[in-house]
Amino acid sequence: MTSSLSRPSGRRADELRKVALTRHYTKHAEGSVLVEFGDTKVICTASVVERVPEFLRERGQGWLTAEYGMLPRATHTRSDREAARGKQTGRTQEIQRLIGRALRAVFDLEALGPRTINIDCDVIQADGGTRTASITGAFVAAHDAVSKLIAAGKLARSPITDHVAAISVGVYEGAPVLDLDYAEDSRCDTDMNVVMTGAGGFVEVQGTAEGVPFSRAEMNALLDLAQAGIGRLVQLQKDVLGADHV
């Protein structure tokens, strides 16, 4: 890390934004969380449906899927609702599939039984890192939904096998940095999103050079940064769940 690096936010290269996870944010969903990464704010809900998609009928297992969207004025300028346009963008489809894959990586779907957990991630304010914030918050929402199933006697044990969280990293002004906000993300040389389990396994790595190719050494440095950051996020998840951890 270079000591001369000046991030727009004034953070150190390895410093997360202020992260907050507020549980039980809405009253109807089985699990709900407001996740905040600095000025990025996402409402994550987990809803339980006592059925599975057609392709899983008679398989004796459950399913977890995700949807993602942004409010029209979540960004600097208003965007039309995708429902009004009649179709989702490729970006939206990519992100919601990523969220679903990330959470399924830490779920025993057979132990979940023949039911579906629907994750909804709605971005109410975007300042970079909405997909990584969504994954980190959605895990806690899904955990609370599972806790309610156990309390209701619908599950004998938790189907959750580990924690999962995600963070962005990038090369900004020639230096690897953790948790990019919009000001950095829009000007970085490399942008990477990393999803990992609490045990340190990689679920997904999405990395792109924005004009300037990155070296193997830079990639290793970015992954090291991401692993350390995700470790702190997993600890925050555990702290927030506290005695309710299943």
Swiss-Prot record:
InterPro entries: ExoRNase_PH_dom1, ExoRNase_PH_dom2, ExoRNase_PH_dom2_sf, PNPase/RNase_PH_dom_sf, Ribosomal_Su5_D2-typ_SF, RNase_PH, RNase_PH_bac-type, RNase_PH_CS. NCBIfam families: RNasePH. It comes from Burkholderia vietnamiensis (strain G4 / LMG 22486) (Burkholderia cepacia (strain R1808)). Phosphorolytic 3'-5' exoribonuclease that plays an important role in tRNA 3'-end maturation. Removes nucleotide residues following the 3'-CCA terminus of tRNAs; can also add nucleotides to the ends of RNA molecules by using nucleoside diphosphates as substrates, but this may not be physiologically important. Probably plays a role in initiation of 16S rRNA degradation (leading to ribosome degradation) during starvation. This is Ribonuclease PH. Its EC number is 2.7.7.56. It catalyses: tRNA(n+1) + phosphate = tRNA(n) + a ribonucleoside 5'-diphosphate. Pfam families: RNase_PH, RNase_PH_C. The keyword tRNA processing applies.
